[in-house]
Design a protein with these regions (language model features):
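Hydrophobic aliphatic residues
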Residues: 13, 174, 222, 292-293
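Residues that scaffold the ATP/ADP-binding catalytic core of kinase and kinase-like folds
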Residues: 70, 218, 288, 292
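ABC transporter nucleotide-binding domain
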Residues: 172-255
Length: 298
């Protein structure tokens, strides 16, 4: 059964469209990356899924049915704006929020201690939230999100404030949840995290769906737009090259829509350049994001 099925969502504010005909689904055991520029309509889409607000038209089904009180307890939501009680010790905050998801105290306490230990936070469980670093608070928020073993996770910038060690720890835990069959929506501006974690991607720009599908297939579609070259010496201007990006492997050349890799190779040869490597590359999701956010939706 599909965990989330969104059909033809529309939402406007004061006559200005924020979400325009967005359709997608998320199944068990997969992570969908929800990406787009600021103000693209991602937050509105998430709020509609969570029933925080109603769409002007369109439908959302969770586990094959409309949102209900029973369905809400199958969802774990990690918002970008944190909702922890700052004057409470971490463990008290976790247990209180777990109770709102229907967990009894004994079960919640056992589960909380397990998660605190997994995240390296067990020794800090009696520390008040207000005395914790941003990264520690983020880990507590993550624990609150998953403590009731939800079937659907919706996470907005989950890695914000985390150091590299805790980022890797959380990524591993999220990957394990996916392997356990959880459906996960990951909304973030960190394209490298999307590439590492997500199976599929939905990009919204100006309220519209501009990219949707398997991440590998999406990257393959953009393969012709970039080549990686390594040469001896320096080369001059190349017609049809819109950007040069120096990296540890040489130079990545971003090509205009109507420019073929062969024409660039011919130009380099015409300049008498010794070419050690010329490879049609699959551009990073970051590059694709910039390309699509710039208004080209082909």
């Amino acid at each position: 059964m599909t965990a989330v099925a969104v059909q033809h969502l529309y939402k406007s504010y004061n006559g200005e469209p924020a979400v325009k005909d967005v359709t997608f689904s998320v199944g068990p055991g997969e992570i969908l990356g929800l990406i787009g520029p600021n103000g693209a309509g991602k937050s509105s889409t998430v709020k509609i899924i969570l029933d925080f607000m109603k769409p002007d038209s369109g439908e959302v089904e969770l586990f094959g049915q409309p949102m209900s009180e029973a369905t809400k307890n199958q969802i774990g939501y990690l918002p970008e704006a944190k909702g922890l009680y700052k004057d409470l010790p971490a463990i008290d905050c976790i247990l209180y929020l777990a109770s709102l998801k229907g967990m009894d105290k004994a079960t919640a306490k056992k589960r909380a201690d397990e998660l605190l230990e997994q995240t390296g936070m067990l020794d800090s469980k009696k520390k008040k939230i207000k005395h914790m670093s941003k990264g520690m608070g983020q880990m507590i928020q993550f624990i609150v999100t998953i403590i009731h073993d939800p079937e659907l996770l919706i996470m907005d910038e989950p890695f914000a404030g985390l150091d590299p060690v805790n980022t890797e720890l959380m990524k591993n835990m999220v990957g394990k949840l996916r392997d356990e069959g959880k459906a996960i929506i990951l909304s973030t501006h960190q394209m490298n995290q999307v590439e590492e974690l997500c199976d599929r991607v939905l990009m919204i720009n100006k309220g519209e769906e501009v990219l949707y599908g398997d991440l590998k297939q999406i990257k393959s579609r953009f393969k012709k737009h970039s080549v990686q070259v390594s040469v001896d010496g320096e080369f001059g201007d190349l017609t049809g090259v819109t950007e040069k990006r120096v990296n540890k492997e040489g130079v990545e050349l971003v090509l205009a829509e109507d420019t073929s890799p062969q024409s660039v190779l011919d130009q380099l040869r015409d300049q008498g350049i010794i070419i050690n490597r010329f490879e049609i590359t699959t551009p990073s999701l970051h590059t694709i994001f910039l390309h699509m956010a710039g208004g080209n939706h082909e």
